[in-house]
Regions:
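Hydrophobic/aromatic end-of-helix segments at the C-terminal termini of transmembrane alpha-helices
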Residues: 75, 79, 229-238, 242-246, ...
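Glycine-rich segments within core transmembrane alpha-helices of 12-TM secondary carriers
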Residues: 4-12, 68, 88-116, 260-267, ...
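Intracellular loop-helix junctions on the cytosolic face of multi-pass helical membrane proteins
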Residues: 41, 50-52, 56-57, 84-235, ...
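Transmembrane alpha-helices of Major Facilitator/SLC transporters
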Residues: 7-14, 195-204, 256-282, 290-303, ...
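Intracellular juxtamembrane helix-capping segments at the cytosolic ends
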Residues: 68-84, 334-356
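C-terminal ends and interior cores of transmembrane alpha-helices
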Residues: 33-52, 293-316
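A membrane-interface helix-boundary motif in multi-pass transporters
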Residues: 25-33, 114-132, 181-193, 283-287, ...
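Loop-to-transmembrane helix entry/capping segments in MFS-fold secondary transporters
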Residues: 80, 84-97, 253-254, 320-321, ...
Length: 488
């Protein structure tokens, strides 16, 4: 699974390549076409192979995930661009994209789940082949809005934004190092490798990213790290057979992986609609305060099941209580917590570098998740939980959830006060920050001098912003002239 998930850690590298090297004059269209062809080829091999080894399957899933993460990244870059140029900071685009993602997940759970449970795998692979080819037609018809670029390599963009490109390269190398530590090392080595990579990347980000981008990026990393994942132990607790855990829920895999996922996908859609209708206009800090307390509330359901309060104290059977908590409440809260991160990430993307910037920001969030899971594995071992041989032991799991999923997330609150903007989520943050979130990521020394001479008065700040925009436009013209000269 580590090898299969490796491409998601290298998204920043592919974002840099697509932003700086147009393919056929486009930075997204033909990259997505090639990714769809690659994914269909992987599905075709899986569908037609009579027998396949574990290593071959891991390699194929790695290629498949590479294709999926390229499509995912480039679409994220495109809707980040549309939010800046057309959306005026509104959440409609993000909500629509994730509505489609959630609907697709719901459809996949309904169709693929029951078939996979019955061992019907190859027909699913043939279906995946067809689905992988479907996006190619609208792309070739030009339905993805994108202007054709001049030149085969945007060397001016590379020179002007070498800091973020360097960060993207280091991030990809760090992801590879963590994958190797996971494959060949212990839980300790994975934890220390991920922590070391995090500190290195945070330091580089502080030096190469604009202050606003760097501080918001650090906050999103802290959000992921603050809720230490004990999901591995919880999954064993839920599905452990009676022979290994006498007083457990004893869920079947069909219920746990299929039907709970179907219910969860439906209520995830409900969470998306609640965010769009009620929360998308909230203050950035306040919405993260709210989501922090909601995540803490969701952890109560897991503690209640682990401590058996639902059956012994409340008289609610395990299946009903699990559906109420993990399949209804948790998906709603997860979506409400997730969408503000997506909105903030999209708003902070630099013009012309949407894929690179998004991949770097999302990469830090993924890195935070890796640290969270690594720390969770360490905590599970330290608390003496036994999940490898029968009988299983989860005596300290409730305490672990209380500390890791209820106390630790409270650390986010002071970080939100100092690292996040005091603005509404639907405001165009790149304007609210006087250019810092968008324009400043490409400022030259002249522009930085102007930005630093702002006195703080509204009238003079407007003059400063206008001057910065003028110089930035002139610099962009120079870059385009240089690129045309190189092409000639």
């Amino acid at each position: 699974m580590t090898l299969a998930a490796l491409p998601w850690g290298t998204k920043a590298l592919f974002g840099s390549i697509s932003d700086s090297v147009p393919l056929g004059g486009y930075t997204k269209r033909y990259y997505i076409v090639l990714a769809c062809i690659m994914l269909s080829a992987v599905a075709g091999v899986l569908a037609s192979a009579e027998e396949i080894s574990a290593r071959e399957a891991a390699g194929l899933f790695c290629l498949g995930n590479l294709a999926i993460c390229i499509v995912d990244l480039l679409i994220e870059g495109k809707y980040s661009e549309l939010m800046r140029t057309r959306g005026e900071g509104r959440s409609d685009i993000v909500t629509f994209v994730w509505l489609m993602v959630m609907f697709g997940g719901l459809l996949a759970s309904v169709i693929a789940g029951p078939l996979a449970d019955q061992g019907i795998i190859q027909p699913l692979a043939w279906g995946a082949l067809v689905m992988a080819l479907l996006p190619i037609l609208p792309l070739l018809f030009g339905w993805l809005p994108e202007e054709k670029q001049v030149g085969c390599c945007m060397t001016g963009k590379l020179r002007q934004n070498r800091g973020i490109f360097f960060l993207a390269l280091v991030m990809s190398l760090a992801a590879f190092s963590i994958a190797m530590a996971t494959l060949f090392g212990s839980s300790y080595s994975k934890l220390f490798t991920s922590l070391g990579a995090s500190l290195l990347l945070i330091t580089i980000a502080d030096k190469t990213l604009p202050p606003v981008l760097s501080s918001c990026n650090l906050f999103m990393f802290v959000v992921e790290v603050s809720s230490i994942s004990l999901g591995g132990a919880l999954q064993y607790f839920f599905v452990a057979p009676e022979t290994c855990l006498a007083d457990g829920p004893h869920f079947s895999y069909v219920f746990f992986t299929t039907w709970a996922s179907v219910i969860g996908a439906f209520f995830g859609l409900l969470g998306l609609m609640i965010f769009q209708w009620r929360l998308s206009h909230w203050n950035v800090r306040k919405i993260f305060y709210l989501t922090t307390f909601l995540r803490i509330f969701a952890a109560i359901f897991d503690i209640a099941m682990v401590q058996r309060w639902n059956t012994n104290e409340l008289g609610i059977d395990d299946h009903t209580f699990f559906v109420l908590g993990d399949a209804i409440v948790s998906p709603v809260i997860s979506m409400i917590s997730f969408l503000p991160l997506v909105m903030l990430t999209s708003k902070l993307c630099s013009a012309g570098l949407e894929s690179t910037t998004y991949s770097v920001l999302a990469g830090f969030q993924n890195l935070g998740s890796i640290v969270s899971r690594s720390a969770g594995s360490f905590v599970i071992g330290q608390l003496g939980m036994q999940t490898t041989t029968c009988p299983y032991s989860f005596d300290n799991l409730g305490t672990g959830i209380a500390v890791c999923n209820m106390a630790m997330p409270l650390l986010v609150i002071p970080f939100a006060r100092f690292l996040l903007p005091n603005a509404r989520l639907d405001e165009p943050l790149y304007e609210w920050f006087q250019g810092s979130g968008d324009l400043r990521s490409a400022l030259t020394s002249d522009e930085m001098w102007l930005a630093n001479t702002s006195s703080g008065s509204e009238e003079e700040d407007v003059v400063t912003i206008t001057a910065i925009e003028k110089i930035a436009a002139e610099n962009q013209e120079k870059i385009e002239i240089d690129e045309r000269d190189l092409d000639l």
